[in-house]
């Protein structure tokens, strides 16, 4: 812990952390991926966001219990090492970094698509390349610069979503509808096109692959514990605000969108938010919303690079990543991890140059696997921590999980169910395969390199003289 105080700078305030949690959770999954989820489930996608949101809140409370009890950078990777063993910590830490890289690939891809709204003739990879260099540079600055940027970008998103919800209600009241469309905007759109659950329970279940992707990154609150000024006060406040945010930013937003515009006409060419307002003939709103979804993508990329970098820093401190990852700049930023993330994102530039348009669902479903795996490990770690504690220690917890042990158990069952969803539907089976290969590679890497290295380190530190005392 002492080493931690000398290393990363505690430069993030309550304001920064609250908005970072928002920034990481409101991004490409909502502004772009929601179109795929709507096509799968129809208006019933609202139920999917409510159910998924409840499970995510339990993950956040489990993480919050551990982060308040022991705030460290690289948080849940280190917690897993402590309570489930070093291999579990290694797998969790690297899978989180993998999750952030894949989510980032989705975000930079979406950024290129959004820019195509204004510049349809410019190749998408050009925009992707530019944003990778810009965000990478910003993340090399002082952590406070990062926090400030995240605050203002998130504030813009929140303001725009609130304005869009109010505007949507206005459209419903005054009955504006798109050119050539005889169906006026209104609540009837939620059941007039095949009913509330047009694709049946199967469509609702299929949508979880994209819905859970939308929540990915919200666990960054735990990562910030090592750089929060007052973690025991700040983190509970940030986590307890999660349910309200899910209701407002996902459920209410999509409710308004599907009420003002027939859901079968919501396509995946660009953001559905921009498309709907453009088709309703409100061009200025479409332009403003495109600025907002671009800022949302930038904000999410920003959070992802921060989170993965801090996790790799924590792994390096435990000897589970190259030592260079623990090197700090004069600003107290783990610069090598930022460079590695930037290099990985250049792979996104290549992908956007080479691959077809329908790759977003594949990237999103791979990210869903990594995200849900991380959440499952967080839940298991919290259960292991509780089992290792005495009744007195449990009574002293400052931010305990509610409805223990039933709520965490229900969340664990739900996460396993999402893996089943990925494996069942043909469009997402590749994600389960990629995820399984990734986990196997990590187990092999741990057994071949990390474990022997840890054993060597233990031998070096062993002093025979001590054993004769």
UniProtKB/Swiss-Prot annotation:
<keyword id="KW-0769">Symport</keyword>
<feature type="transmembrane region" description="Helical">
    <location>
        <begin position="126"/>
        <end position="146"/>
    </location>
</feature>
<comment type="similarity">
    <text>Belongs to the amino acid-polyamine-organocation (APC) superfamily. Amino acid transporter (AAT) (TC 2.A.3.1) family.</text>
</comment>
<feature type="transmembrane region" description="Helical">
    <location>
        <begin position="40"/>
        <end position="60"/>
    </location>
</feature>
<feature type="transmembrane region" description="Helical">
    <location>
        <begin position="430"/>
        <end position="450"/>
    </location>
</feature>
<dbReference type="GO" id="GO:0006865">
    <property type="term" value="P:amino acid transport"/>
</dbReference>
<feature type="transmembrane region" description="Helical">
    <location>
        <begin position="335"/>
        <end position="355"/>
    </location>
</feature>
<feature type="transmembrane region" description="Helical">
    <location>
        <begin position="403"/>
        <end position="423"/>
    </location>
</feature>
<comment type="function">
    <text>Major high-affinity histidine transporter. Binds and catalyzes the uptake of histidine into the cell. Functions as an histidine:proton symporter with high specificity for histidine. Required for histidine utilization, but not for competitive colonization of sugar beet seedlings.</text>
</comment>
<dbReference type="GO" id="GO:0015293">
    <property type="term" value="F:symporter activity"/>
</dbReference>
<keyword id="KW-1133">Transmembrane helix</keyword>
<feature type="transmembrane region" description="Helical">
    <location>
        <begin position="19"/>
        <end position="39"/>
    </location>
</feature>
<keyword id="KW-0997">Cell inner membrane</keyword>
<feature type="transmembrane region" description="Helical">
    <location>
        <begin position="246"/>
        <end position="266"/>
    </location>
</feature>
<keyword id="KW-0813">Transport</keyword>
<dbReference type="InterPro" id="IPR004841">
    <property type="entry name" value="AA-permease/SLC12A_dom"/>
</dbReference>
<dbReference type="InterPro" id="IPR004840">
    <property type="entry name" value="Amino_acid_permease_CS"/>
</dbReference>
<dbReference type="Pfam" id="PF00324">
    <property type="entry name" value="AA_permease"/>
</dbReference>
<feature type="transmembrane region" description="Helical">
    <location>
        <begin position="360"/>
        <end position="380"/>
    </location>
</feature>
<feature type="transmembrane region" description="Helical">
    <location>
        <begin position="281"/>
        <end position="301"/>
    </location>
</feature>
<protein>
    <recommendedName>
        <fullName>L-histidine transporter HutT</fullName>
    </recommendedName>
</protein>
<dbReference type="GO" id="GO:0005886">
    <property type="term" value="C:plasma membrane"/>
</dbReference>
<keyword id="KW-1003">Cell membrane</keyword>
<keyword id="KW-0812">Transmembrane</keyword>
<feature type="transmembrane region" description="Helical">
    <location>
        <begin position="201"/>
        <end position="221"/>
    </location>
</feature>
<feature type="transmembrane region" description="Helical">
    <location>
        <begin position="100"/>
        <end position="120"/>
    </location>
</feature>
<feature type="transmembrane region" description="Helical">
    <location>
        <begin position="156"/>
        <end position="176"/>
    </location>
</feature>
<keyword id="KW-0472">Membrane</keyword>
<keyword id="KW-0029">Amino-acid transport</keyword>
């Amino acid at each position: 812990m002492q080493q931690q105080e000398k290393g990363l700078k505690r430069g993030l305030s309550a304001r920064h952390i609250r908005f970072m949690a928002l920034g990481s959770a409101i991004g490409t999954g909502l502004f772009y991926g929601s179109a795929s989820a709507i096509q799968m489930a129809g208006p019933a996608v609202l139920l999917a966001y409510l159910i998924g949101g409840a499970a995510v809140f339990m993950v956040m409370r489990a993480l919050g219990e551990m982060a308040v009890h022991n705030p460290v950078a690289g948080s849940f990777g280190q917690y897993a090492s402590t309570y489930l063993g070093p291999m579990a910590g290694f797998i969790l830490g690297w899978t989180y970094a993998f999750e952030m890289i894949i989510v980032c690939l989705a975000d930079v891809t979406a950024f290129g698509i959004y820019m195509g709204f204004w510049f349809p003739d410019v190749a998408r990879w050009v925009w992707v390349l530019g944003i990778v260099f810009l965000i990478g540079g910003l993340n090399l600055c002082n952590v406070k610069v990062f926090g400030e940027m995240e605050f203002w970008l998130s504030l813009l998103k929140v303001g725009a979503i609130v304005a869009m919800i109010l505007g949507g209600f206005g459209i419903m009241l005054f009955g504006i509808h798109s050119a050539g469309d005889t169906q006026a905007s209104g609540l009837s759109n939620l059941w007039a096109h095949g009913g509330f659950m047009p694709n049946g329970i199967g469509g609702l279940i299929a949508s979880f692959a994209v819905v859970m992707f939308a929540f990915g990154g919200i666990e960054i609150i735990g990562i910030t514990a090592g750089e929060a000024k007052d973690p025991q006060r700040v983190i509970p406040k940030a986590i307890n605000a999660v349910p309200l945010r899910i209701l407002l930013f996902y459920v209410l937003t999509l409710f308004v969108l599907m009420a003002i515009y027939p859901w079968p006409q919501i396509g995946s060419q660009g953001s559905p938010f921009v498309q709907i307002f453009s088709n309703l003939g409100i061009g200025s709103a479409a332009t403003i919303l495109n600025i907002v979804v671009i800022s949302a993508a930038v904000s999410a990329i920003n959070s992802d690079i921060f989170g993965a970098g801090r996790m790799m820093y924590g792994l390096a401190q435990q000897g589970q990543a190259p030592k260079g990852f623990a090197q700090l700049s004069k600003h107290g930023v783990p610069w090598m991890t930022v460079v590695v993330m930037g290099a990985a994102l250049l792979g996104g530039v290549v992908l956007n140059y080479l691959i077809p348009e329908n790759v977003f669902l594949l990237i999103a479903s791979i990210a869903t696997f990594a995200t849900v795996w991380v959440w499952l490990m967080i839940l298991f770690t919290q259960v292991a921590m509780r089992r290792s504690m005495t009744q007195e220690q449990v009574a002293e917890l400052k931010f305990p999980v509610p409805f223990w042990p039933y709520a965490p158990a229900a969340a664990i069952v739900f996460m396993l169910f999402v893996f089943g969803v990925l494996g069942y539907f043909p469009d997402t089976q590749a994600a389960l395969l990629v995820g399984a290969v990734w986990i196997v590679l990590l187990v092999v890497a741990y057994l071949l390199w990390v474990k022997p290295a840890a054993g060597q380190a233990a031998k070096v530190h062993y002093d025979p003289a001590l054993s004769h005392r």
